[in-house]
UniProtKB/Swiss-Prot annotation:
Record's function text: Stimulates guanine exchange activity of SOS1. May play a role in membrane ruffling and remodeling of the actin cytoskeleton.
SH3 domain boundaries: 478-537
Subcellular location(s) per record: Cytoplasm
Protein name: Epidermal growth factor receptor kinase substrate 8-like protein 1
Family annotation (CDD domains): PTB_EPS8, SAM_EPS8-like, SH3_Eps8
GO CC list: cytosol; extracellular exosome; plasma membrane; protein-containing complex; ruffle membrane
Tissues and organs where the protein is expressed, per its UniProt entry: Detected in placenta.
Comp. bias intervals (Pro residues): 553-568
Gene3D superfamilies, per the entry: Pleckstrin-homology domain (PH domain)/Phosphotyrosine-binding domain (PTB) (2.30.29.30), SH3 Domains (2.30.30.40), Transcription Factor, Ets-1 (1.10.150.50)
């Protein structure tokens, strides 16, 4: 078969020519549109009232915001086309901003101070704007240099009509993508130094080479001392949380829980930073709205509108749950972190909590967040350490924030587990391949178990040891559990209850050393357990109050107890003896004698305490004096009072008490150590805590006003759309 030859025969393309043709076609397609996932960090308008007049000023301000944890990265897509650079919403692909290539004044990769990788810088000058905008982006999959080359190639093609430079840039981009580098290795997280995490990390490094000082977990402190390894125990041997896992695992457990706390603080601060950015964007939009002459959307407003959008209800719920979780975790870690301690770190959360409550419309929304429940230790930590202003906020949030989970109805569904913005998850198993339990849920389970185990115990702690079927008549006649108050007690805060000697009180919760009781007037509060003794209680078939029942005909006298020695005679007031309780009838004489001796010792201690508490000339204590506050405007006397209130030694107080607040705030850690080698680091930590509290207070008022305006504006737009 002959093969056609000659000029009319089409030449057969070679493999090389086919490859070149496909390469040219691929280049045309690639040169048309490219798209990059990026994080938008911040936008500055040059010349506005924030001290940013040049690109260098913008870079320096970004570094300052980054060091303060005020940079909120917002993920989006950056698309480069032959005539525009467009920003898109990554989920909906909605166009946020579109900048003509002719409006791009500068495109560069810059390295702000304190960063390890470059950022993409875009300076855009719109015709209708007097000053250009400066945008900073962080590449997620590719470095800023490659994205810059693509945009600069598009600019060169736009201005000269020649596309070789962009084609080369896109080929370099494809080669980089084909290397399939790990995103985690390519893109480190945005540099943030949250104040609380930095303080905790400093404590860890100073305390034990980056590890917290691991002490027994809270439930081990309150439970009975565990038996030596190899011995048997009757205390719920099936529960792994009642016994320690050994000193090494105790340290690992403390480290794990401190790490969880760090990530909770990270997420809370990230959310607050987002609120601040949203408020700033709303303020800029409002400023532009007042100066706008036409209804056409100005350049840059799509990005600002997205930033000004407040968080969703689910996001508010998530951060409020994490704050509740942090309260319980701080109480659990009370023995593992110091300088600052858990009570001091507690104050860090109230600034964000106040801001979140205000921007969500008030305490009603936060009150609806029931999970996770607070532990009893968390409620005690809050009750004993909040300031009057914090207490006002705390009590406004309702029972789900002020009462422990033991007093609330159980929630349906799986236990709460925090999910962190960064995707981090705590280790699942320990080195022995045993599963770690969630620390807060573990504490709640322990408290429930402890209450169940203590319920049938004898009247040493006010409980009855009666089987329901053994005393049906008594069960029907006595409502609840009743105690007699032996001493006057004056409440010191809103959660405590003032009581008088010989008051009959109903016990609502006796799981801790402070019992929750109700007086005859129906008022509830906490009183110390060691001023109370068991009382039979009022009879339901009598129409009389507990207070009147005390003065009415007393019940028949119980069987007499063994007479104590004369030197330890009991007080004269009338009250039931230990062996007057029916629950002791089944005990042998040696056990009865043991309980009698316990009562004797307890009464002697109470009598000695009463000598210092009561007396005819004893003044009724007033409300607790407010703790001295430190600020840059404090004088030397206020600084001295603040140092004394924090418990520093007289040498440290004398050395630093001559400074003003501004001078003390200006000192660095090494300078404080030079003045006081033993306590300099702790002074620096306390000053850091105080500085953060002051910064939070300054931010709240401005943010509240801006968010309220933004909320009204959004509501107005919704109403207009409905109309």
């Amino acid at each position: 078969m002959s093969t056609a030859t000659g000029p009319e025969a089409a030449p057969k393309p070679s493999a090389k020519s086919i490859y070149e043709q496909r390469k040219r076609y691929s280049t045309v397609v690639m040169a048309d549109v490219s798209q990059y996932p990026v994080n938008h960090l911040v936008t500055f308008c040059l010349g506005e009232d924030d001290g940013v007049h040049t690109v260098e000023d913008a870079s320096r301000k970004l570094a300052v915001m980054d060091s303060q944890g005020r940079v909120w990265a917002q993920e989006m897509l950056l698309r480069v086309s032959p005539d525009h650079v467009t920003l898109l919403d990554p989920a909906s692909k909605e166009e946020l901003e579109s900048y003509p290539l002719g409006a791009i004044v500068r495109c560069d990769a810059v390295m702000p101070p304190g960063r390890s990788r470059s950022l993409l810088l875009l300076v855009c000058q719109e015709p209708e704007r007097a000053q250009p905008d400066v945008h900073f982006f962080q590449g997620l999959r590719l470095g800023a240099e490659l994205i810059r080359e693509d945009i600069q190639g598009a600019l060169h093609n736009y201005r000269s009509g020649r596309g070789e430079r962009r084609a080369a840039a896109l080929r370099a981009t494809q080669e980089e993508l084909q290397r399939d580098r790990s995103p985690a290795a390519e893109t480190p997280p945005l540099q943030r130094r949250p104040s609380v995490r930095a303080v905790i990390s400093t404590v860890e490094r100073g305390a034990g080479r980056g590890r917290p000082q691991a002490k027994p977990i809270p439930e081990a402190e309150e439970a009975q001392r565990p038996e030596p390894v190899g011995t048997s125990s009757n205390a719920d041997s099936a529960s792994p949380d009642l016994g320690p896992r050994g000193p090494d695992l105790a340290v690992l457990q403390a480290e794990r829980e401190v790490d969880i706390l760090n990530h909770v603080f990270d997420d809370v601060e990230s959310f607050v930073s987002r609120l601040q950015k949203s408020a700033e964007a709303a303020r800029v939009l409002e400023h532009r709205e007042r100066g706008r002459r036409s209804r056409r959307r100005a350049a840059g407003e799509g990005l600002l509108t997205l930033r000004a959008k407040p968080p969703s209800e689910a996001e508010y719920t998530d951060v409020l749950q994490k704050i509740k979780y942090a309260f319980s975790l701080l109480a659990r870690l009370r023995g593992n972190i110091a300088d600052p301690s858990s009570p001091e770190l507690l104050h860090f959360l109230f600034g964000p909590l106040q801001m979140i409550v205000n921007t969500s419309g008030g305490p009603e929304f936060a009150s609806s967040v029931r999970r996770p429940h607070l532990t009893s230790d968390a409620v005690a930590l809050l009750r004993d350490n909040v300031t009057p202003r914090e207490n006002e906020l705390w009590t406004s949030l309702g029972d789900s924030w002020t009462r422990p989970g033991l007093e609330l109805s159980p929630e349906e569904g799986p236990p709460y587990r925090p999910e962190f913005f960064s995707g981090w998850e705590p280790p699942v198993t320990d080195p022995q391949s045993r599963a770690w339990e969630d620390p807060v849920e573990k504490q709640l389970q322990h408290e429930r178990r402890r209450r169940q185990q203590s319920a049938p115990q004898v009247a040493v702690n006010g409980h009855r040891d009666l089987e329901p079927e053994s005393e049906p008549q008594l069960e029907s006649e006595t409502a609840g559990k009743w105690v007699l108050c032996n001493y006057d007690f004056q409440a010191r805060n809103s959660s405590e209850l003032s009581v008088k000697q010989r008051d009959v009180l109903e016990v609502l919760d006796d799981s801790r050393k402070w019992w929750k009781v109700r007086d005859p007037a129906g008022q509830e509060g906490y009183v110390p357990y060691n001023i109370l003794t068991p009382y039979p209680g009022p009879r339901l078939h009598h129409s009389q109050s507990p207070a009147r029942s005390l003065n009415s005909t007393p019940p028949p006298p119980p069987a007499p107890a063994p007479a104590p020695p004369p030197a330890l005679a009991r007080p004269r007031w009338d009250r039931p003896r230990w062996d007057s309780c029916d629950s002791l009838n089944g005990l042998d004489p040696s056990e009865k004698e043991k309980f009698s001796q316990m009562l004797i010792v307890n009464e002697e201690l109470q009598a000695r305490l009463a000598q210092g508490r009561s007396g005819p000339s004893r003044a009724v204590p007033g409300p607790r004096a407010p703790e001295p506050q430190l600020s840059p405007g404090s004088d030397a006397s206020e600084v001295r009072a603040w140092l004394q209130a924090k418990g520093f030694s007289s040498g440290t107080v004398d050395a630093l008490g001559v400074l003003t607040g501004a001078q003390l705030f200006s000192l660095q850690k090494e300078e404080l150590r030079a003045v006081s080698p033993e306590e300099g680091a702790r002074v620096y930590s306390q000053v850091t805590v105080q500085r953060s509290l002051l910064e939070d207070k300054e931010k709240v008022s401005e943010l509240e006003a801006v968010m309220e305006k933004q909320k009204k504006k959004v509501e107005g737009e919704v109403e207009m759309e409905v109309i």
